[in-house]
Amino acid sequence: MRVEIDSHSGFCFGVVRAISRAEEALQEQGEVFSLGDIVHNRVEVQRLERLGMHTVTHDQMPGLKGRSLFIRAHGEPPSTYRLAEELGIELIDATCPVVAKLQRRVVEAHEKMRQVGGQVVILGKRGHAEVIGLTGQVEAPTLVVETEEDLDQIDFTRPIYFLSQTTQSISLFQHLCDRCLLYTSPSPRDPKTSR
């Protein structure tokens, strides 16, 4: 049997960049702490652990005073950066540039929607590190939808700014946008009955 591996397969550039930054930090410092697994790949996490990377949670941050803490490609909310500063933790920020741009867009979206009484909606997986980082960019509530059924959370009488987690399907995002447009058309249909 012959197995071919697509030359374009593998980690996204944000994860490749984060792994490279982690390797550099490990080479310089010998030991680095990562806030959550650097990547959703057990083999790669174990390889980095053998080099001196330790995965920690937010609850363990107080014990890292004076040490280096790695922010993975998924990014973090501003509260994490503030806590690290308060605790004297040096951050190695490997937030993916695409995610960082999306974080800024979330802040801008909330400002625009605040002015018109609207709402910000993100297509994403609840509890995923990137989504936690996105929703944590502002104090105002952000709706997170995973499926068409979740559109029931949206108040279609108010303006909507719809964004997506970077790893979500473009076709699902477009489908949900189309459904939102249907519900907000001049004669909106009830989302519960027009699926």
Placement of each model-derived feature along the sequence:
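Active-site loop-to-helix "anion-binding N-cap" substructures in soluble metabolic enzymes
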Residues: R2-V138, T142-D155, S169-I170, H175-L181
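Short beta-strands and strand-loop turn motifs
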Residues: D6, L163-S164, S185
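Active-site donor-nucleotide binding/catalytic segment of nucleotide-sugar enzymes
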Residues: R158-I170
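Conserved small/polar residues in nucleotide/adenosyl-binding loops
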Residues: Y183-R189
